Amino acid sequence: MKKFTLDEIDHQILDILIENARTPFTDIAKQLLVSAGTIHVRVKKMEDEGIIQGSTLSLNYEKMGYSFIAHVGVFLEKTSMTQAVIENLRKIPNVTVAYVTAGKYNIFCKVRAKGTNDAKDIIYEIDDVPGVNRTETMIALEESINDKKRMMHAIFKEL
């Protein structure tokens, strides 16, 4: 399979879209001194190659009343139950991230809640998932770094 290569214009397009995925192609074209058609064609090609996959919406959970963050380490009864447990965790909307891990926990989850009572109920719900042996919870005091943009910029500099 031939590797798709990005040139400097592609990098600049991606840099702009990383900062704001809703930037109009005409604005990008003006910044890069190319036509809007060029931007459209290049973005379409990057979408076709799977480099760009949709666009995302970022929410401010705190402003929506979900400022409490907990990380839950999940111990399974048997590792063969991993996929079934993951499928059940998908049904709990407050579980926003789940990783299958090697090490102390079988699964590691990020949970968003309104407060401690809400978090307690969510953790009990996780504990009740068939296949879960027990959990350990860590409460986040502050989300100090949550910046996917820096990683994306670093990757594009390597390409």
Residue ranges and their predicted role:
Residues M1-L159:
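A compositional/biophysical signature of low hydrophobicity enriched in polar/charged and small residues
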